[in-house]
Design a protein with these regions (language model features):
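Charged/polar low-complexity intrinsically disordered segments
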Residues: 13, 31-34, 43
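Cationic, low-complexity basic patches in intrinsically disordered or flexible, solvent-exposed regions
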Residues: 15-17
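A glycine- and charged-residue-rich anion-binding loop/surface
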Residues: 45-279, 283, 287, 293-294
Length: 294
């Protein structure tokens, strides 16, 4: 029923009556239906989630208001007005942790809205605390910044582009657009660790379109709109949506573990930070027999 079809009252009275009926319908339908209406409005242009992980990559604990909660495959899809949970994207996996006492199993983004898959329902309108798994976040930051260091060096020395990047559970793979010999990769590794020892700063910026047009940056130049630029001082300038450490020293160290020809270029497997220390140190432990006493 449209309010214009109501007879015997003025147009203003028709509109007021229609709004009362609509409000009465909304407050009497089931909570799940309310959520459905809310999500439909959200997907049709409501405000994007405030992304705390962009404001401060070290933010691991926060409070936010629950905007929606929908059952999905035995779990619940939750949206908030703000979040520090990084959603999967740009080759980087999603954060894990806890939200309002529920475990966060996955995080993804759609049309600027970050959706958290959690193990228990949360109440719409409730303010909840989020706790991001700090060890996992730091690991991803180390791997991602390490990749930028290596990719920046390869681009500067050989002119190759990074055409593929993935942080896996065990290894990081980077695909370059040209061939690289073992000797060249050894030089790249040494140069990358030198950058780490120099503790070069890593900065984030959102340049205005006029500034961006003058900026010589690597990767994703086809993107439009607000572009996030990650700069490793004197090494790399790249458009990127991932989380990063503040200084290269926090990467710890880099090891290029293998390389293979791939689609006319080179796929490099690498380890950074704690992954490198744990994996390589554990595989090179030797035991010395204690001398027997006389």
């Amino acid at each position: 029923m449209h309010y214009s079809t109501i007879s015997g009252v003025s147009d203003n009275e028709k509109l007021e009556l229609f709004l009362v009926l609509l409000l009465n319908f909304y407050v009497t339908i089931s909570p799940i239906s309310k959520i459905g209406l809310f999500i439909e409005r959200k997907e049709n242009g409501m405000a994007e989630t405030r992304k705390l992980y962009y404001e401060n990559g070290a933010c691991l604990q926060f409070c936010a208001t629950v905007l929606s909660c929908v059952p999905t495959d035995g779990n619940f899809a939750v949206t908030l007005d703000a979040t520090a949970f990084y959603p999967e994207g740009g080759g980087q996996p999603a954060d894990r942790g806890a939200l309002g006492g529920a475990r966060v199993l996955d995080v993804h983004e759609k049309d600027g809205v970050v959706v958290h898959t959690v193990t228990a329902p949360l109440h719409v309108g409730e303010v909840v605390q989020g706790d991001v798994d700090g060890r996992r976040r730091l690991d991803h930051m180390q791997q991602h910044t390490g990749e930028h260091i290596v990719s920046g060096i390869v681009h500067a020395q050989f002119g190759y582009d990074n055409v593929g990047f993935h942080i896996g559970a065990q290894d990081v793979t980077v695909d370059f657009s040209g061939p690289l010999t073992d000797a060249e990769l050894a030089d790249v590794e040494r140069a990358a660790n030198w950058v780490i020892w120099q503790n070069a700063p890593v900065t984030i910026a959102w340049p205005a379109p006029s500034e961006l047009a003058q900026l010589n940056y690597r990767s994703k130049k086809e993107l439009t709109g607000a572009i996030r630029i990650v700069t490793v001082a004197n090494v790399d300038v790249c458009a990127c949506c991932g989380t990063h450490v503040e200084r290269c020293g926090q990467v710890g160290s880099i090891k290029l573990t293998s390389a293979q020809s791939y689609k006319g270029g080179t796929r490099v497997t690498m380890l950074c930070g704690d992954r490198k220390s744990t994996r390589l140190n554990s595989s090179h432990i030797t035991r010395s027999r204690m001398p027997s006493s006389a």
